[in-house]
Amino acid sequence: MEKKYVLSIDQGTTSSRAIIFDKAGQIQKVTQKEFTQIFPNPGWVEHDAMEIWSSVQSVVAEALADVPAAEIAAIGITNQRETTVVWDKNTGKPVYNAIVWQSRQTMDICNELKEKGLDPIVREKTGLLIDAYFSGTKVKWILDNVEGAREKAEAGDLLFGTIDTWLVWKLTGGAVHVTDYTNASRTLMYNIHELKWDEEILEALTVPASMLPEVKPSSEVYGNTHKDKFQGMEIPISGMAGDQQAALFGQACFEEGMAKNTYGTGCFMLMNTGEKAVPSKNGLLTTIAWGVDGKVEYALEGSIFVAGSAVQWLRDGMRMFRDAKDSELYATRVQSSEGVYMVPAFVGLGAPYWDSEVRGAMFGLTRGTTKEHFVRATLESLCYQTKDVLSAMEADSGIELAKLRVDGGAVANDLLLQIQSDFLGVPVERPMCIETTALGAAYLAGLAVGFWADKNDIKKNFGIDREFDPKMEETEAAKLYEGWQKAVEATMAFK
């Protein structure tokens, strides 16, 4: 039977999805299933890794109800990054819940490592900061806090993996224990320059090397599905990348200096820096973009904590409208925010500030300020924060941004993208397919089996739904941005 499709498994923070793509990069089928969020203590976030596996089996079975498995050329996996699973390799069962990227339960471990002066070493070797966000301290926490776990780990009976690793292990019936360069680069344990697990950091974290998966390129046949899992078929699993890197690949940002921004609950921006790992002096992370065609390419990354969730706050907390889509309607009723600035630091500020203690603020209110000004100022705050991060990227890389590609739920808002283009002074491109994360995983998988010939073949599929060009005078944009910088400074001073 002709191989017509590639199946993407998109394992996210709140749901698992299966998406089937054809050769033109068009979606043929989407299935989705949510799973339980577990909050054992304030600031802790966990998932049941067996429930995640069950949700993946469910969405895959549903997707293959209409498309014969025999027509699937390959499977690609993209995943919530950093989320940590530790399981017994003999029973196949996790020894503890998966500790999610958002979870802060390892803050004490992070503080101990910082007190030992390890921050500069970790920064130089991994491109990351010592933070509870990343996997390394989560593995240590499980070994230190789950009865018998450390003994089992030292006996070689426990395995660690981020979600990609866990899913491949399950899909292959326990035959394959691998991760890819992108996911390894988010663990806090991987040397992104030497491309190996770092012994010095493993020793500091007291994590046995025997637990760790083999690190492979992002596009390679890792193994086949166990025939019991896929309608009796053995299908190659041949692409893997963390969600943000997969989106960069799905947006065809293959050249140095190309960047994408994902507007979700928060924002994630990545800029391709080519075969050079650029160290950041401006509060960004240095990470691996992908390993494809026998070479590793790098990216600068900036995370904004609050973006779409600020619009949700206007809807749910302030009751300003019933549907998030109405934010565009209200914001277009005024020509500007009339000097009103909103700094949405509800959970602190991410890149490039990294201040977890600061809280949100509004500035410039008068008797003439209306709900419409509030809403517009909130949308503008997403765009100002994006400019903050992209300015840091330009300063670190020495590359001037030529255009920005965008994806995520909020990009349906035309006004938001026009404001973004105005503030950046460059075109903003919204692609035809906004499922860029799943598409990136599909492309990586398809490349490995020859479903797509090369990156040029993929580029041909990339279509722009709409391009937003700057309409605002540069002097006006600069003046508004200066006001934003003052607002952030004042917000950070108020604690």
Curated annotation (Swiss-Prot):
Keywords: ATP-binding, Glycerol metabolism, Kinase, Nucleotide-binding, Transferase
Chain positions recorded as ADP binding sites: 13, 17, 265, 308, 409, 413
Binding sites annotated in the UniProt record for glycerol: 81-82, 133, 243-244
Residues that bind sn-glycerol 3-phosphate: 13, 81-82, 133, 243
Single GO molecular function: ATP binding
Gene name of this polypeptide: glpK
UniProt: ATP binding residues: 13-15, 265, 308, 312, 409
Natural source organism: Maridesulfovibrio salexigens (strain ATCC 14822 / DSM 2638 / NCIMB 8403 / VKM B-1763)
Listed name of the protein: Glycerol kinase
EC number(s) on file: 2.7.1.30
Taxonomic superkingdom: Bacteria
Pathway: Polyol metabolism; glycerol degradation via glycerol kinase pathway; sn-glycerol 3-phosphate from glycerol: step 1/1
